[in-house]
Amino acid sequence: MGKVVSVILAGGKGKRMGAEVSKQFIEINGKPIIYYTLKAFEECKGIDEIILVLPKDEIDYFKREIEPRFDFKISKIIEGGKERQDSVYNALNSIGDCDIVLIHDGARAFVSNKIIEDGIKYSREFGAAAPGVMPKDTIKVKNLEGFSVDTPNRASLVAVQTPQCFKYNLIKKGHNKVKNEKIQVTDDTMIVELLGEKVYLFEGDYKNIKVTTPEDLILAEHFVK
């Protein structure tokens, strides 16, 4: 089995939280959100290496205020880019020999060991895989005037989560393509689809939330208790 590397993207700001620090540094039960995220990957036996991606102006803060408090097993800290895809590109370029790479939102602090292990397994089998859950609400498609024009079958819809998991050579090829062709994407599975490849969607977890709003923070505090 080749090496498995996880890339943790911790570039989110805390504006919607009304916080003075970036959301990954907001504390829950005395520990920053990023602590719980890193801990989940450190405790997974299938992960060989962890790369943390931070904005340039937050690397010193992390090293000074966060890292000394915890025994993190981070192999390297990489400077993020202007957009999410730029941050992933920087991280991929920092990886040497690697078989599988998992790309995860730093604010998804409650990812389970099962999701991580399943992601490794399915990406080895299919080349690309991501967890997801069925939307709980009915989804509507609206036109530019604001009117509903379609109601997709909810059974065919998936709200995609992270970690999004790939064979390294596949996702590296995809990121090179969108970089060279200046294509904007919203996540990494979209990059693989642009290559004409399929992404296997496996069962995620409704608990695997991205902590983004004050309401999310209340739920996160409940999960930690």
UniProtKB/Swiss-Prot annotation:
Pfam family, one: IspD
Annotated site, Transition state stabilizer, chain positions: R16, K23
Site (Positions MEP for the nucleophilic attack): R154, K210
Catalytic activity, EC: 2.7.7.60
Keywords attached to this entry: Isoprene biosynthesis, Nucleotidyltransferase, Transferase
The protein's annotated pathway: Isoprenoid biosynthesis; isopentenyl diphosphate biosynthesis via DXP pathway; isopentenyl diphosphate from 1-deoxy-D-xylulose 5-phosphate: step 2/6
Keyword Nucleotidyltransferase applies: yes
UniProt keyword Nucleotidyltransferase present: yes
Enzymatic reactions: 2-C-methyl-D-erythritol 4-phosphate + CTP + H(+) = 4-CDP-2-C-methyl-D-erythritol + diphosphate
Molecular functions (GO terms): 2-C-methyl-D-erythritol 4-phosphate cytidylyltransferase activity
Signal sequence, renumbered to the chain: none
CDD domains reported for this sequence: CDP-ME_synthetase (cd02516)
GO BP terms in the entry: isopentenyl diphosphate biosynthetic process, methylerythritol 4-phosphate pathway
NCBIfam families noted in UniProt: ispD, PRK00155.1-3
Function in brief: Catalyzes the formation of 4-diphosphocytidyl-2-C-methyl-D-erythritol from CTP and 2-C-methyl-D-erythritol 4-phosphate (MEP).
Family: Belongs to the IspD/TarI cytidylyltransferase family. IspD subfamily.
The protein's name in its UniProt record: 2-C-methyl-D-erythritol 4-phosphate cytidylyltransferase
Species: Clostridium perfringens (strain 13 / Type A)
Gene: ispD
